[in-house]
């Protein structure tokens, strides 16, 4: 073998045939022992033969290292040892030989030693410390090749402990003359950053060196530095999300050290992001130079200059432009140019840059013009014959859907064809796109398509993805409860059985986690908490029909002697047993199904191979059905005896409980009541019995929790503590903001502060207002044209002429209490408007009249409000801000948007004309799936998303709202019962509460109600409270039911209170009210 190979090389050298340089170099480095090893391993036919060959080779290598050999022979043995290590065999005997080889003066031997150590030595090995000396010698060498070999070895052999020994030397090498040394030095810094983390960049010297390398003249050094910045941006691109997680950890952790560390991480990440965003113009400039082709020809690959550098720059810009409008504005021009340049090259590299550019434009702050341009370029991918191109086209569409869903419309046929593609990866990505484009209008056809694929698919991973997608969109966009129940029940019936051996062999993890599906338990909550009986009847009909069908199939297979009946999943059996046991009584008479038949079917399910927890659910369901039936069955005694000795402890417990319940038939309905899943337990009754029992035995009397801590129920603090901010009802609201002073009272609408008696100045103002009102009644003024006020925003208000879009009467805002004058002004205004409409019927309501150009867009006018008044809740009326007059630049932008919309519509029409020969079934499916987008083409995407989120309440949020409401009701009931207990235990109280009827006060209350000045009356009129809590002589409270304090009645409550009592309730009532009460 060896002689023939040597003869071949000698023949080639002696002949005139040119011998390849690579073959000559291999001949100089290796002998033919390595060739024999590789050939014998390739020709081996079994694992045993391969092991035998490797063991013999290891014996040969040990004998070679034990003898004195030449350096070339040792180098060849190290290469054979690397090959054995690559096949998975341990070669610890050669580590010391490789370390000695790194100290050789010949560069080839030194590089072989470094390569062997970096590949064969594990992390944190003892010999790594011994390699530090040889690496430092290599870094200090005058030969740049030795320096490069040492830097290459550092990327694999250095750990956190040895970084300080090399850092300063690596920073010095960034100024080396050779660009390859500078490039490898930047790569070593990148390795240091990955080992240490963000704290490595705390040194300003390192950041300055990285910026210097970014501006290096050699493109290889520049591309190496881009990789470091890319890693930093990927780690800190989602800064807000990371900060929220860290803040949540701070709230959960009580340790000051952990909080301090987390705060340091937040500050460090902010500094790094700000540093990177300062470099955005530099990154944009580099991308522009590379796209223009200013690099040397050695960096050209398939006609494109340095495509990997362009891709890294695009990823970096996408991370920095995420949710940052200022940074994104620097990128738009260069990204458009890069996209245009990539379209010139119809090869894989050009397609890769085009796809990455589209992805970047969808991730940064969106520019609709550029995104529309991206959607046109997606046709290059989708019309390609190769599945890989279509795969990237579907991925690009999925990224565009997040920004502008209507741009998917021209490619609806291609998407539907991809859904039926034989390529599995393309099909999965198409269904992912279908999931992302789901909205409230197309949720039904999308779910049906996903369920259809769920039935046909055999890949368990793909099935788990489809199940999560179906349940997510069903909970988010469910049109009604019936549809949600049908969808989730269908998904549960399709789920595979966990105990099936084939499924366990395929994917144990997914099948064992079926019990963790939250959507199944949401289904139980929805049905149990729903008040509509039709919902409960519907779900019980579904599961009872499934029982009947499965019984028929089982009987047929028993007759045919077959046992291939597909079992349902454990989670499906749990839901089915619960539903049937709770609500089967609603439809038993309609379907002719008897409880005994259902019980017998459930007993048959116990014989099948289900989990112990699932069988416990079945036993509980049988117990509920027996309670409804009112008698025991013979089969149940056998069943309970059998499962008392079950391997599952929970089955033993449930069967024992059922056996005890069957002994007392009268107590069945009490222990297992009908439809009592969501009934609230009254703990007061339970604990009162415990309290009575402890009193009889001689225990101590129960003391409430509030009294144990000596905390009063009502604030009885002195006037000295009146300035403390305490929680309580606020009976005062601020005065209306001055419309002519926009900076007044904008931050806090309802400031909480202590109430003070009115000053003399305020009393004088009230008297002047009353005198003005009397004068207006005697001498009514002529109605004036109301001054127009244009509300532009929170900080800007501008007085305009009578041609304002939103006429607002400033007098009404400044003096809302003048009710009679408002009525007179409104009557005069209506008369003037009628006259104006008769004169100018084309321009009613005195709105702004402009004569727009033909090409200019029409201004959008707001409707005239009836009233804009300041009340306790703020402004009442149409508060929408009218648009400003469009500037010439805005008019040009609006014209451009209109032309772009018309062009996009024309392109859609042309695209639809090209697909006239489409299968009608596909066309019908496309209308169903994409119908929601065609209806909302002219809407803004952001507003559309917000509207869907507001109008569309998911199942989970619905259940959470119900839960919070129930908890509030329970807490209110507890508070009321607790107050009653306090009143019962309190001593006899002395108080005089007189309710008198006073007509004068009635008139005053009506006037004050119109003027919004009497806060006490407003409280009664707005809240319609029928309960009045009065604190009398200390800590006790008394509940007085007052049916005459509603908004319709005008009776006055007079309380005869002592001075101490008035001091006690000064935190809840105003000072003015107290003075009036004391006077009365």
From Swiss-Prot:
* One GO BP annotation of this record: intracellular protein transport
Can you say where the HEAT repeats lie in this chain?
161-198, 201-238, 369-405, 406-443, 445-479
The membrane topology of this protein is:
Peripheral membrane protein
Offer an example of a GO molecular function term for this protein: cargo adaptor activity
Q: Which gene encodes it?
A: ap4e1
Q: Where is this region: Disordered?
A: 711-782, 801-920, 933-973, 996-1027
Please describe what this protein does: Probable component of an adaptor protein complex. Adaptor protein complexes are vesicle coat components involved both in vesicle formation and cargo selection. They control the vesicular transport of proteins in different trafficking pathways.
Tell me what this protein is called: AP-4 complex subunit epsilon
What is said about its interaction partners and assembly? Answer: May be part of the adaptor protein complex 4 (AP-4), a heterotetramer composed of two large adaptins (epsilon-type subunitand beta-type subunit), a medium adaptin (mu-type subunit) and a small adaptin (sigma-type).
């Amino acid at each position: 073998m060896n002689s023939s190979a040597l003869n071949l090389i000698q023949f080639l050298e002696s002949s005139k045939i040119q011998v390849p340089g690579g073959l000559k170099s291999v001949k100089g480095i290796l002998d033919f022992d390595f060739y024999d090893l590789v050939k014998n391993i390739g020709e081996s036919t079994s694992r045993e033969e391969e092991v035998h060959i490797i063991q013999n080779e290891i014996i040969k290598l040990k004998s070679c290292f034990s003898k004195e050999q030449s350096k070339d022979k040792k180098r060849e043995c190290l290469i054979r040892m690397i090959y054995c290590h690559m096949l998975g065999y341990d070669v610890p005997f050669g580590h010391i030989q490789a370390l000695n080889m790194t100290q050789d003066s010949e560069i080839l031997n030194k590089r072989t030693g470094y390569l062997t150590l970096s590949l064969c030595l594990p992390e944190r090995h003892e010999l790594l410390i011994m390699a530090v000396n040889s690496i430092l010698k290599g870094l200090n060498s005058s030969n740049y090749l030795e320096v490069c070999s040492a830097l290459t070895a550092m990327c694999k052999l250095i750990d956190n402990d040895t970084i300080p020994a090399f850092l300063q030397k690596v920073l010095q090498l960034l100024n080396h003359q050779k660009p390859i040394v500078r490039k490898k030095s930047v790569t070593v810094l990148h390795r240091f950053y990955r080992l240490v983390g963000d704290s490595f960049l705390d040194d300003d010297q390192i950041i300055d060196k990285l910026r210097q390398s970014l501006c290096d003249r050699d493109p290889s050094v520049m591309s190496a530095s881009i990789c470091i910045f890319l890693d930093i941006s990927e780690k800190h691109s989602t800064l807000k999300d990371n900060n929220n997680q860290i803040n949540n950890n701070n709230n959960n952790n009580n340790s000051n050290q952990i909080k301090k560390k987390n705060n340091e991480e937040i500050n460090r990440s902010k500094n790094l992001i700000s540093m990177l965003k300062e470099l955005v113009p530099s990154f944009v400039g580099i991308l522009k130079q590379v796209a223009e082709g200013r690099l040397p020809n050695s960096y050209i690959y398939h006609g494109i200059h340095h495509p990997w550098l362009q891709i890294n720059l695009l990823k970096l810009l996408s991370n920095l432009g995420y949710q940052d409008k200022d940074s994104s504005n620097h990128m738009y021009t260069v990204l458009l140019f890069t996209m245009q340049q990539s379209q010139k090259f119809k090869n894989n590299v050009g397609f890769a840059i085009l796809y990455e550019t589209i992805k970047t434009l969808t991730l940064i702050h969106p520019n609709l013009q550029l995104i529309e341009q991206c959607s046109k370029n997606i046709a290059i991918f989708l019309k390609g014959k190769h599945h890989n191109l279509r795969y990237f086209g579907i991925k690009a569409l999925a990224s565009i859907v997040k920004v502008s869903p209507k741009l998917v419309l021209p490619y609806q046929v291609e998407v539907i064809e991809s859904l039926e593609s034989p390529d599995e990866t393309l099909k999965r990505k198409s269904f992912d796109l279908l999931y992302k484009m789901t909205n409230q209008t197309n949720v039904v056809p999308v779910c049906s398509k996903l369920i259809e694929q769920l039935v046909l698919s055999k890949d368990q991973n793909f099935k788990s993805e489809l199940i999560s997608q179906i349940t997510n969109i069903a909970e988010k966009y469910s049109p009604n409860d019936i549809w949600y129940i049908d969808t989730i029940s269908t998904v549960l019936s399709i789920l595979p059985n966990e105990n099936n051996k084939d499924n366990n062999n395929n994917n144990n993890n997914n099948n064992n986690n079926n019990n963790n599906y939250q959507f199944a338990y949401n289904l139980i909550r929805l049905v149990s908490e729903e008040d509509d009986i039709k919902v409960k009847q519907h779900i019980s009909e579904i599961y009872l029909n499934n029982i009947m069908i499965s019984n028929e199939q089982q009987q047929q297979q028993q007759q045919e002697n077959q046992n291939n009946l597909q079992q349902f999943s454990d989670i499906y059996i749990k839901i089915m047993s619960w539903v049937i046991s709770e609500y089967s009584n609603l439809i038993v008479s309609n379907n002719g199904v008897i409880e005994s038949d259902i019980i017998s079917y459930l007993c048959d399910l116990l014989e099948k191979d289900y989990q112990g927890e699932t069988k416990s659910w079945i036993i509980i369901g049988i117990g509920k059905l027996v309670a409804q039936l009112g008698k025991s069955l013979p089969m149940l005694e056998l069943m309970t005896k059998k499962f008392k000795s079950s391997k599952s402890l929970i089955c033993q417990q449930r069967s024992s409980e059922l056996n005890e319940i069957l002994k007392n038939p009268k107590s069945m309905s009490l222990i297992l009541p009908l439809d009592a899943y969501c009934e609230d337990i009254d703990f007061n009754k339970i604990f009162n019995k415990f309290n009575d029992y402890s009193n009889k035995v001689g225990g101590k009397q129960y003391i409430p929790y509030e009294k144990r801590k000596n905390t009063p129920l009502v604030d009885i603090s002195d006037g000295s503590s009146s300035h403390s901010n305490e929680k309580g009802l606020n009976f005062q609201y601020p005065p209306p903001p001055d419309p002519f002073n926009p900076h007044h009272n904008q931050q806090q609408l309802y400031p909480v502060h202590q109430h003070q008696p009115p000053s003399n100045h305020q009393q004088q103002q009230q008297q002047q207002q009353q005198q003005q009102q009397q004068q207006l009644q005697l001498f009514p003024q002529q109605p004036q044209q109301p001054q127009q006020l244009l509300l532009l925003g929170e900080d800007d208000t501008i007085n305009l002429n009578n041609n304002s879009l939103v006429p607002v009467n400033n007098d009404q805002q400044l003096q809302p209490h003048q009710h009679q004058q408002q009525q007179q002004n409104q009557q005069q205004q209506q008369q003037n408007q009628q006259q104006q409409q008769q004169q100018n019927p084309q321009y009613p309501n005195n709105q702004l009249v402009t004569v727009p150009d033909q090409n200019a867009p029409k201004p959008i006018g707001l409707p005239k409000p009836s009233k804009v008044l300041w009340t306790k809740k703020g402004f009442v009326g149409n508060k929408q801000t009218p648009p400003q007059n469009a500037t010439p630049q805005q008019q040009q932008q609006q014209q451009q948007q209109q032309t772009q919309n018309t062009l996009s519509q024309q392109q859609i029409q042309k695209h639809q004309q090209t697909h006239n020969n489409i299968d009608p079934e596909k066309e019908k499916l496309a209308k169903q799936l994409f119908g929601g987008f065609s209806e909302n083409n002219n809407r803004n995407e952001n507003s559309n998303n917000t509207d869907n989120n507001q109008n569309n309440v998911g199942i989970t949020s619905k259940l959470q709202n119900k839960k919070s409401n129930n908890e509030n009701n329970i807490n209110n009931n507890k508070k009321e019962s607790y107050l009653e207990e306090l009143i019962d235990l309190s001593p006899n109280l002395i108080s005089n509460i007189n309710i008198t009827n006073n007509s004068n006060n009635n008139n005053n209350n009506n006037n004050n109600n119109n003027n919004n000045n009497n806060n006490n009356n407003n409280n009664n009129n707005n809240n319609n409270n029928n309960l009045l809590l009065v604190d009398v002589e200390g800590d006790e409270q008394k509940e007085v039911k007052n049916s005459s304090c509603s908004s319709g009645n005008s009776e006055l409550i007079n309380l005869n209170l002592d001075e101490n009592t008035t001091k006690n309730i000064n935190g809840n009532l105003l000072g003015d009210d107290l003075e009036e009460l004391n006077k009365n």
